[in-house]
A protein has these predicted regions:
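Catalytic core of tubulin tyrosine ligase-like
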Residues: 231-236, 244-248, 253-341
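Generic structural motif recognizing short loop/turn segments at the entrances and edges of beta-strands
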Residues: 28-30, 58-63, 146, 175-178, ...
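N-terminal glycine-rich phosphate-binding loop and ensuing alpha1 helix
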Residues: 2-180, 188, 197-215, 224-225, ...
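Conserved beta-loop-beta/alpha segment of the NTase-like Rossmann-fold superfamily
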Residues: 171, 176-275
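Generic beta-strand/beta-sheet core signal
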Residues: 101, 112, 153, 182, ...
Length: 341
Protein backbone atom coordinates (compact mmCIF):
# COMPACT_ATOMS: atom_id res chain seq x y z
CA UNK A 1 0.00 0.00 0.00
CA UNK A 2 1.35 3.40 -1.01
CA UNK A 3 1.91 6.03 1.68
CA UNK A 4 0.47 9.50 1.29
CA UNK A 5 3.64 10.95 -0.29
CA UNK A 6 3.68 8.33 -3.02
CA UNK A 7 -0.07 8.68 -3.55
CA UNK A 8 0.06 12.44 -4.03
CA UNK A 9 2.99 12.19 -6.42
CA UNK A 10 1.50 9.32 -8.42
CA UNK A 11 -1.89 10.99 -8.89
CA UNK A 12 -0.64 14.55 -9.41
CA UNK A 13 -2.10 15.91 -6.17
CA UNK A 14 1.07 17.59 -4.90
CA UNK A 15 -0.87 20.74 -3.96
CA UNK A 16 -2.01 18.86 -0.84
CA UNK A 17 1.52 18.95 0.56
CA UNK A 18 1.09 22.63 1.40
CA UNK A 19 -2.07 21.87 3.42
CA UNK A 20 -0.17 19.22 5.36
CA UNK A 21 2.55 21.77 6.14
CA UNK A 22 -0.02 24.44 7.09
CA UNK A 23 -2.04 22.22 9.45
CA UNK A 24 -2.46 24.14 12.73
CA UNK A 25 -1.75 21.16 15.03
CA UNK A 26 0.02 17.83 14.83
CA UNK A 27 -3.30 16.10 15.49
CA UNK A 28 -4.94 17.90 12.56
CA UNK A 29 -1.99 17.03 10.35
CA UNK A 30 -2.26 13.33 11.16
CA UNK A 31 -6.02 13.38 10.60
CA UNK A 32 -5.58 15.05 7.21
CA UNK A 33 -2.96 12.50 6.15
CA UNK A 34 -5.30 9.72 7.26
CA UNK A 35 -8.05 11.22 5.07
CA UNK A 36 -5.71 11.32 2.09
CA UNK A 37 -4.79 7.66 2.48
CA UNK A 38 -8.48 6.67 2.47
CA UNK A 39 -9.20 8.31 -0.91
CA UNK A 40 -9.63 5.95 -3.88
CA UNK A 41 -7.39 7.97 -6.20
CA UNK A 42 -7.56 5.46 -9.03
CA UNK A 43 -11.35 5.66 -9.12
CA UNK A 44 -11.25 9.46 -8.98
CA UNK A 45 -8.75 9.65 -11.82
CA UNK A 46 -10.88 7.40 -14.00
CA UNK A 47 -14.01 9.44 -13.25
CA UNK A 48 -12.18 12.66 -14.05
CA UNK A 49 -10.97 11.27 -17.39
CA UNK A 50 -14.47 10.08 -18.23
CA UNK A 51 -15.98 13.48 -17.46
CA UNK A 52 -13.46 15.22 -19.71
CA UNK A 53 -13.82 13.04 -22.77
CA UNK A 54 -14.53 14.90 -25.97
CA UNK A 55 -18.32 14.93 -25.70
CA UNK A 56 -18.96 15.29 -29.42
CA UNK A 57 -16.83 12.24 -30.16
CA UNK A 58 -18.67 10.24 -27.49
CA UNK A 59 -22.07 11.19 -28.90
CA UNK A 60 -21.03 10.25 -32.43
CA UNK A 61 -20.91 6.64 -31.22
CA UNK A 62 -24.47 6.84 -29.82
CA UNK A 63 -27.43 6.11 -32.08
CA UNK A 64 -30.57 7.82 -30.78
CA UNK A 65 -34.07 6.60 -31.59
CA UNK A 66 -37.59 7.43 -30.48
CA UNK A 67 -38.93 5.23 -27.70
CA UNK A 68 -42.49 3.93 -27.58
CA UNK A 69 -44.70 5.18 -24.75
CA UNK A 70 -48.17 4.22 -23.53
CA UNK A 71 -50.81 6.95 -23.36
CA UNK A 72 -53.25 5.94 -20.64
CA UNK A 73 -55.98 8.08 -22.20
CA UNK A 74 -55.99 5.71 -25.16
CA UNK A 75 -56.79 2.57 -23.17
CA UNK A 76 -60.30 1.19 -23.54
CA UNK A 77 -62.49 1.09 -20.43
CA UNK A 78 -61.93 -2.67 -20.12
CA UNK A 79 -58.15 -2.29 -20.44
CA UNK A 80 -58.08 0.53 -17.92
CA UNK A 81 -60.21 -1.36 -15.39
CA UNK A 82 -58.08 -4.49 -15.76
CA UNK A 83 -54.84 -2.56 -15.23
CA UNK A 84 -56.29 -0.66 -12.26
CA UNK A 85 -57.50 -3.89 -10.67
CA UNK A 86 -54.03 -5.43 -10.93
CA UNK A 87 -52.37 -2.31 -9.51
CA UNK A 88 -54.80 -1.88 -6.63
CA UNK A 89 -54.33 -5.49 -5.57
CA UNK A 90 -50.54 -5.01 -5.36
CA UNK A 91 -50.97 -1.91 -3.19
CA UNK A 92 -53.66 -3.49 -0.98
CA UNK A 93 -51.36 -6.47 -0.40
CA UNK A 94 -48.70 -4.03 0.86
CA UNK A 95 -46.28 -5.19 -1.83
CA UNK A 96 -45.58 -1.57 -2.75
CA UNK A 97 -43.15 0.91 -1.19
CA UNK A 98 -42.14 4.51 -1.77
CA UNK A 99 -38.62 5.94 -1.79
CA UNK A 100 -38.06 9.70 -1.59
CA UNK A 101 -34.71 11.09 -2.74
CA UNK A 102 -34.00 13.89 -0.28
CA UNK A 103 -30.23 14.16 -0.09
CA UNK A 104 -30.06 17.75 -1.30
CA UNK A 105 -29.86 21.05 0.52
CA UNK A 106 -32.29 23.92 -0.07
CA UNK A 107 -29.56 26.31 -1.22
CA UNK A 108 -31.00 26.96 -4.68
CA UNK A 109 -34.36 27.70 -3.08
CA UNK A 110 -32.78 30.27 -0.79
CA UNK A 111 -33.40 27.93 2.13
CA UNK A 112 -30.96 26.91 4.84
CA UNK A 113 -31.41 23.24 5.65
CA UNK A 114 -32.51 20.04 3.89
CA UNK A 115 -34.48 20.66 0.72
CA UNK A 116 -37.39 18.64 2.10
CA UNK A 117 -37.78 21.10 4.99
CA UNK A 118 -38.45 23.96 2.55
CA UNK A 119 -41.91 25.42 3.23
CA UNK A 120 -44.39 26.11 0.43
CA UNK A 121 -47.09 28.74 0.84
CA UNK A 122 -49.99 26.36 0.15
CA UNK A 123 -53.57 26.74 1.34
CA UNK A 124 -54.97 26.62 3.95
CA UNK A 125 -51.58 26.77 5.70
CA UNK A 126 -47.91 26.64 4.68
CA UNK A 127 -46.35 23.18 4.65
CA UNK A 128 -42.90 21.74 4.11
CA UNK A 129 -42.23 19.43 1.19
CA UNK A 130 -41.82 16.55 3.63
CA UNK A 131 -45.21 17.29 5.22
CA UNK A 132 -46.92 17.42 1.82
CA UNK A 133 -45.48 14.02 0.88
CA UNK A 134 -46.36 12.50 4.26
CA UNK A 135 -49.96 13.71 4.09
CA UNK A 136 -50.33 12.45 0.52
CA UNK A 137 -49.08 9.02 1.58
CA UNK A 138 -51.42 8.98 4.60
CA UNK A 139 -54.37 9.59 2.24
CA UNK A 140 -53.24 6.69 0.06
CA UNK A 141 -52.85 4.47 3.12
CA UNK A 142 -56.41 5.26 4.16
CA UNK A 143 -57.72 4.56 0.67
CA UNK A 144 -56.05 1.16 0.38
CA UNK A 145 -56.23 0.10 4.03
CA UNK A 146 -52.48 -0.28 4.48
CA UNK A 147 -49.43 1.51 5.87
CA UNK A 148 -46.89 1.76 3.08
CA UNK A 149 -43.20 1.52 3.90
CA UNK A 150 -41.59 4.89 3.24
CA UNK A 151 -37.84 5.04 2.70
CA UNK A 152 -36.09 8.41 2.66
CA UNK A 153 -32.65 8.89 1.16
CA UNK A 154 -30.62 11.57 2.90
CA UNK A 155 -26.97 12.52 2.57
CA UNK A 156 -24.02 12.89 4.92
CA UNK A 157 -24.63 16.63 4.73
CA UNK A 158 -28.27 16.65 5.78
CA UNK A 159 -29.05 13.31 7.44
CA UNK A 160 -29.01 14.48 11.06
CA UNK A 161 -31.06 17.58 10.28
CA UNK A 162 -33.59 15.55 8.30
CA UNK A 163 -34.08 12.91 11.00
CA UNK A 164 -34.46 15.65 13.64
CA UNK A 165 -36.93 17.55 11.43
CA UNK A 166 -39.16 14.48 11.27
CA UNK A 167 -38.89 13.81 15.00
CA UNK A 168 -39.59 17.46 15.90
CA UNK A 169 -42.73 17.36 13.75
CA UNK A 170 -43.96 14.01 15.09
CA UNK A 171 -43.28 12.46 11.67
CA UNK A 172 -46.15 14.53 10.26
CA UNK A 173 -48.63 11.97 11.57
CA UNK A 174 -47.04 9.07 9.68
CA UNK A 175 -46.40 5.85 11.61
CA UNK A 176 -42.69 6.19 12.36
CA UNK A 177 -42.23 2.40 12.41
CA UNK A 178 -42.77 2.48 8.63
CA UNK A 179 -40.24 5.25 7.93
CA UNK A 180 -36.58 4.41 7.38
CA UNK A 181 -33.74 6.77 6.52
CA UNK A 182 -30.63 5.84 4.59
CA UNK A 183 -27.70 7.86 3.28
CA UNK A 184 -26.50 8.16 -0.29
CA UNK A 185 -22.80 7.87 -1.01
CA UNK A 186 -20.38 10.73 -1.48
CA UNK A 187 -17.25 11.51 -3.45
CA UNK A 188 -14.37 13.95 -2.97
CA UNK A 189 -14.84 17.17 -4.92
CA UNK A 190 -12.44 17.90 -7.76
CA UNK A 191 -11.59 21.27 -9.26
CA UNK A 192 -11.84 21.79 -13.02
CA UNK A 193 -8.19 20.78 -13.36
CA UNK A 194 -8.68 17.56 -11.39
CA UNK A 195 -7.31 18.63 -8.02
CA UNK A 196 -8.84 17.56 -4.72
CA UNK A 197 -10.63 20.42 -2.97
CA UNK A 198 -9.82 21.15 0.69
CA UNK A 199 -12.04 23.21 2.99
CA UNK A 200 -11.01 25.80 5.59
CA UNK A 201 -10.87 23.17 8.34
CA UNK A 202 -8.19 21.21 6.50
CA UNK A 203 -10.58 18.44 5.50
CA UNK A 204 -11.02 17.00 2.03
CA UNK A 205 -14.31 18.33 0.75
CA UNK A 206 -16.96 15.76 -0.18
CA UNK A 207 -20.32 16.03 -1.91
CA UNK A 208 -23.21 13.64 -2.50
CA UNK A 209 -22.35 11.31 -5.35
CA UNK A 210 -25.61 11.76 -7.25
CA UNK A 211 -29.06 10.17 -7.42
CA UNK A 212 -27.67 7.28 -9.46
CA UNK A 213 -25.93 5.93 -6.38
CA UNK A 214 -29.26 5.36 -4.64
CA UNK A 215 -29.29 1.67 -5.58
CA UNK A 216 -25.88 0.98 -4.07
CA UNK A 217 -26.88 2.97 -0.96
CA UNK A 218 -30.03 0.87 -0.60
CA UNK A 219 -27.90 -2.26 -0.75
CA UNK A 220 -25.21 -1.04 1.64
CA UNK A 221 -27.65 0.31 4.23
CA UNK A 222 -29.77 -2.85 4.30
CA UNK A 223 -32.80 -1.25 2.65
CA UNK A 224 -33.13 -3.96 -0.01
CA UNK A 225 -33.01 -6.65 2.68
CA UNK A 226 -35.65 -4.75 4.67
CA UNK A 227 -37.89 -4.56 1.60
CA UNK A 228 -37.57 -8.29 1.01
CA UNK A 229 -38.36 -8.99 4.66
CA UNK A 230 -41.52 -6.88 4.32
CA UNK A 231 -42.64 -8.67 1.16
CA UNK A 232 -42.24 -5.60 -1.05
CA UNK A 233 -42.20 -6.34 -4.78
CA UNK A 234 -42.54 -2.87 -6.35
CA UNK A 235 -40.74 0.33 -5.43
CA UNK A 236 -41.58 3.84 -6.59
CA UNK A 237 -38.68 6.32 -6.46
CA UNK A 238 -39.34 10.04 -6.67
CA UNK A 239 -37.69 13.34 -5.78
CA UNK A 240 -38.54 15.37 -2.69
CA UNK A 241 -38.94 18.64 -4.58
CA UNK A 242 -41.89 17.50 -6.72
CA UNK A 243 -44.87 18.49 -4.57
CA UNK A 244 -47.36 17.32 -7.23
CA UNK A 245 -45.92 13.83 -7.50
CA UNK A 246 -48.42 10.96 -7.47
CA UNK A 247 -46.33 8.33 -5.73
CA UNK A 248 -48.99 5.63 -5.43
CA UNK A 249 -50.34 5.05 -8.93
CA UNK A 250 -52.24 1.78 -9.51
CA UNK A 251 -52.20 2.42 -13.27
CA UNK A 252 -48.40 2.54 -13.36
CA UNK A 253 -47.78 -0.53 -11.21
CA UNK A 254 -50.67 -2.41 -12.81
CA UNK A 255 -49.36 -1.81 -16.32
CA UNK A 256 -45.86 -2.76 -15.22
CA UNK A 257 -47.15 -6.03 -13.76
CA UNK A 258 -49.36 -6.80 -16.76
CA UNK A 259 -46.51 -6.34 -19.22
CA UNK A 260 -43.97 -8.14 -17.05
CA UNK A 261 -41.39 -5.35 -17.19
CA UNK A 262 -38.85 -4.58 -14.48
CA UNK A 263 -38.77 -0.78 -14.74
CA UNK A 264 -41.45 1.73 -15.74
CA UNK A 265 -41.53 5.52 -15.78
CA UNK A 266 -44.15 8.23 -16.05
CA UNK A 267 -43.55 11.05 -18.46
CA UNK A 268 -45.11 14.30 -19.66
CA UNK A 269 -44.61 15.95 -23.03
CA UNK A 270 -42.23 18.91 -23.15
CA UNK A 271 -43.79 22.36 -23.35
CA UNK A 272 -41.52 23.23 -26.25
CA UNK A 273 -38.65 21.60 -28.15
CA UNK A 274 -36.11 23.73 -26.25
CA UNK A 275 -37.42 23.09 -22.74
CA UNK A 276 -34.47 22.26 -20.50
CA UNK A 277 -35.35 18.75 -19.42
CA UNK A 278 -33.93 15.30 -20.09
CA UNK A 279 -35.97 13.09 -22.41
CA UNK A 280 -36.55 9.37 -22.85
CA UNK A 281 -35.14 7.72 -25.94
CA UNK A 282 -33.34 4.63 -27.14
CA UNK A 283 -29.56 4.85 -26.99
CA UNK A 284 -27.94 2.22 -29.16
CA UNK A 285 -31.17 0.24 -29.04
CA UNK A 286 -31.63 0.38 -25.26
CA UNK A 287 -34.03 2.55 -23.24
CA UNK A 288 -32.35 5.55 -21.68
CA UNK A 289 -32.46 9.26 -20.92
CA UNK A 290 -30.49 11.97 -22.66
CA UNK A 291 -29.92 15.32 -20.98
CA UNK A 292 -31.16 18.43 -22.76
CA UNK A 293 -27.61 19.75 -22.92
CA UNK A 294 -26.50 16.60 -24.73
CA UNK A 295 -29.26 16.37 -27.33
CA UNK A 296 -27.93 16.95 -30.87
CA UNK A 297 -29.47 20.15 -32.23
CA UNK A 298 -30.57 18.34 -35.38
CA UNK A 299 -32.95 16.16 -33.31
CA UNK A 300 -34.44 18.76 -30.96
CA UNK A 301 -37.21 19.83 -33.37
CA UNK A 302 -37.68 16.48 -35.11
CA UNK A 303 -41.32 15.36 -35.36
CA UNK A 304 -43.19 12.23 -36.44
CA UNK A 305 -45.89 11.90 -39.10
CA UNK A 306 -48.46 13.36 -36.68
CA UNK A 307 -46.36 16.42 -35.95
CA UNK A 308 -45.46 15.26 -32.43
CA UNK A 309 -41.93 15.65 -31.12
CA UNK A 310 -39.91 12.47 -31.55
CA UNK A 311 -37.94 13.36 -28.44
CA UNK A 312 -40.56 15.06 -26.32
CA UNK A 313 -41.14 12.64 -23.42
CA UNK A 314 -39.66 14.34 -20.35
CA UNK A 315 -37.90 12.43 -17.60
CA UNK A 316 -39.54 13.81 -14.47
CA UNK A 317 -38.07 11.46 -11.84
CA UNK A 318 -41.16 9.24 -11.60
CA UNK A 319 -39.71 5.75 -11.75
CA UNK A 320 -41.04 2.36 -10.68
CA UNK A 321 -38.90 -0.74 -10.17
CA UNK A 322 -39.38 -4.34 -9.22
CA UNK A 323 -37.34 -5.44 -6.22
CA UNK A 324 -35.35 -7.70 -8.56
CA UNK A 325 -34.45 -4.74 -10.77
CA UNK A 326 -33.28 -2.70 -7.78
CA UNK A 327 -31.08 -5.55 -6.60
CA UNK A 328 -29.57 -6.13 -10.04
CA UNK A 329 -28.69 -2.46 -10.48
CA UNK A 330 -27.29 -2.24 -6.95
CA UNK A 331 -24.80 -4.99 -7.71
CA UNK A 332 -23.21 -3.35 -10.76
CA UNK A 333 -21.02 -0.26 -11.00
CA UNK A 334 -22.93 2.37 -12.94
CA UNK A 335 -21.04 5.01 -14.94
CA UNK A 336 -20.99 8.49 -13.41
CA UNK A 337 -22.29 11.61 -15.12
CA UNK A 338 -20.19 14.64 -14.25
CA UNK A 339 -21.71 17.70 -12.58
CA UNK A 340 -19.92 21.04 -12.92
CA UNK A 341 -20.72 23.32 -9.95
Amino acid sequence: MLNYIDLLNKYDQQHLFKYIEMAPTEEKKEKFISEIEKVDFEKLRNLYKLSHQNFENVMKAVILEHIKVFDKSRFSDDERNDILSIGKKIIENNEYAVVTMAGGQGTRLGHKGPKGSFVLNVKPEPKSLFQIIAENLIRENNEYGVILNWYIMTSTENNDETVKFFADNNYFGYNKDYIKFFKQGNLPLLSEDGKLVVNHDFDIKYAASGNGTIYKAMLNDGIIDDMKKNGIKYIFIGAVDNALLNMVDPMLVGLNKKRGTEIASKTIIKNSPNEKVGVFCKKNGKPGVIEYSEMPESLIDEVDENGDLLYGESHIMCNLYTIDAIEKIANVDLPYHSAHK
